[in-house]
Amino acid sequence: MYLSLVDFKKRVEFSLCQQHADDDDVRSFCEKAEKVGVGVVCVNPVNIPLTVELLESQGIEISANIGFPFGSHLPEAKILETRRAVEAGATQIDMVINVGALRSKKDNLVAEDIQGVVEAAQGRTVKAIIETWVLTVEEKQRACRIAEKAGAALVKTTTGVRSQYLLEITSDPKGATIEDMQLMRNVLSPEIKIKASGGIYTLDFALHLIRAGADQLGMSQGEKIIRQFQEHYGNGVELIA
């Protein structure tokens, strides 16, 4: 598989999810995204209007965080957030599924939650975030199947948010892993894409994730890693499985 620099950039998603992000932060973030040439930026719903104003003409997809970061919002709240984000110009949606319902084996509730957002998105790409770092293997498999059946176009590993509650479960929360990429790729249909997010800090790991099945990469270190790709491989590299 040949991976060009342009394709690598398009796989990278920049995120600005901090609760304290102000207008100046959004402007700086968008300027960086435009300069680097990433494929997608992801921001909180309240920051969609300014992000659209700054990036709409640059060919960069603009995604809204929905139900962030825990996914425990009522379905009606997620639907309203999605509708407002779409009205403001969002072209994609990153939604957190109802993880508690999944772990409680209330699969119908999980599916209905996703379906509501998919319908509210009106044909825009919906990414279902399943929070792999708190799930068993069986729960990850079930989450992937539910998300695909409910209409998600892409399944994402984690929000990347390391909360106090997460640290109460594990002292070493992991984001994207090679094992999860392989598991998700084996469960999902070929047309359903996978986004690896959380803990991607090196170029080598990013390339390993792509080899394992990742279509998109959510990285806080994206600018640095893109620069390293260009320094090491120039315009592209042949990835050996």
Model-inferred region functions:
Residues 2-36, 40, 46-194, 201-241:
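Alpha/beta enzyme core
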